[in-house]
Amino acid sequence: MRDTVDPVFSLGISSLWDELRHMPTGGVWWVNADRQQDAISLVNQTIASQTENANVAVIGMEGDPGKVIKLDESHGPEKIRLFTMPDSEKGLYSLPHDLLCSVNPTHYFFILICANNTWRNITSESLHKWLEKMNKWTRFHHCSLLVINPCNNSDKQSSLLMGEYRSLFGLASLRFQGDQHLFDIAFWCNEKGVSARQQLLLCQQDERWTLSHQEETAIQPRSDEKRILSHVAVLEGAPPLSEHWTLFDNNEALFNDARTAQAATIIFSLTQNNQIEPLARRIHTLRRQRGSALKIVVRENIASLRATDERLLLGCGANMIIPWNAPLSRCLTLIESVQGQQFSRYVPEDITTLLSMTQPLKLRGFQPWDTFCDAIHTMMSNTLLPADGKGVLVALRPVPGIRVEQALTLCRPNRTGDIMTIGGNRLVLFLSFCRVNDLDTALNHIFPLPTGDIFSNRMVWFEDKQISAELVQMRLLSPELWGTPLPLAKRADPVINAEHDGRIWRRIPEPLRLLDDTAERAS
């Protein structure tokens, strides 16, 4: 008796070569889609791409799948099985058991259409366990599972899945770019081999997906190490320095072109503080999706970066940050120095972990003594923050004649993460992410008067061990010695007998009678 041959299923994109299309039994594949309608269209054409006798089942999370799934009369199987499931984490874990109650999964092709942003509230650990479970299930039952996930943040989802290559046989994204679609393949493994980091233009006509004609013969670049993709502001008006340089008018266009790079140098420009978080997200996406050979440089054209911002960009995957005061000649030398480098630092898969590093303390201003100690302890215990770079702890003792409560009224921190408390006749400040060599500058911004005129003694701790040791001593202070701020003074009544003449305020004389009429008659 001859053994049954395991079927090989195909993704619904015409003209796509088999290395990027085939899905043999015993594996899980995942495709993110920017739009719901693109996801449904891809599912319908994928069904039509199967053989006439293929066993296909579609599982939908939103509504009735029978209203959106359409069978092609001339292509694909004559009938398919349709299922619905709840949009919940419990429903996902129950999926294998529920399918076994309805069908024999052997040689079946299951297509799971997720609801919009299904995975937003599911942790990466839960996602990892579910993929591992589905991988074992498909291998045991000789079936295939294709997950179609419509979401409005496919970059974040792809970054979370990049490390799941042991459970996923393929990961790709269908990106909508206004007048065209881009099929971004992170990796795809099947009986033909392994392909990775490819981007292909797709055409959609009459609900059919086809490979763009210009992509059918195009060869994916294997080495672009000499290419330099740069923001035009980096060269400060100079023309491209060689044929390897390509200039872009904005960071967004530069980012979109860098999506296809493998080992090129990418140079972003930074001119405003509000560009930092979007730029960090772009750098994180490129580093997670395009690999360690890419050289990512940030050129600060106008002074706008704090130490925490630099740490964020470097943590997201930037090789180097060039400061604003470096001349063009120095800038070009630094760009040349990163050539041939391999990025070796670890980049977390979820960028929110990195963003939380910039403001781990959501406090500002005066805090009670115990709250102050707890906040610093939490900061010192955060392993994601750099060693001996979490901030500076300062204890200030006021000069004779000034109470510590009065000195507190002069302390006006402006940054989130800068907190203070009073106790034991001391004003204690913690300046998050402040370097010890910048302490005097920071204190001059916090106090309106020179600190030497207000305080007679100052003690500083800036290393983690020093701060932790002082924190132990601070916790020993009895609550009776904890200080409290002075009560707010009542607002003075506004002066009503004054007017402004355009230059200064002038009081208006108010006539007063020393004797009233009764006193005059009595005299």
Curated annotation (Swiss-Prot):
Q: Which UniProt keywords apply?
A: Cellulose biosynthesis, Nucleotide-binding
One of its GO biological process terms is: cellulose biosynthetic process
Following inactivation of the gene, the phenotype reported is: Produces much less cellulose, and the timing cellulose synthesis and structure of the fibers may be altered. Deletion can be complemented by the protein from S.typhimurium LT2 or E.coli, however the 'D-415' mutation in the E.coli protein does not complement.
A Gene Ontology molecular function term for this protein is: cyclic-di-GMP binding
Which superkingdom? Bacteria
The record ties this protein, via NCBIfam families, to:
cellulose_bcsE, PRK15045.1
Provide the function of this protein. Binds bis-(3'-5') cyclic diguanylic acid (c-di-GMP). Required for maximal cellulose synthesis, does not act as a protease on BcsA.
Give the record's family classification: Belongs to the BcsE family.
Name of this chain's protein: Cyclic di-GMP binding protein BcsE
User: Its encoding gene is what?
Assistant: bcsE
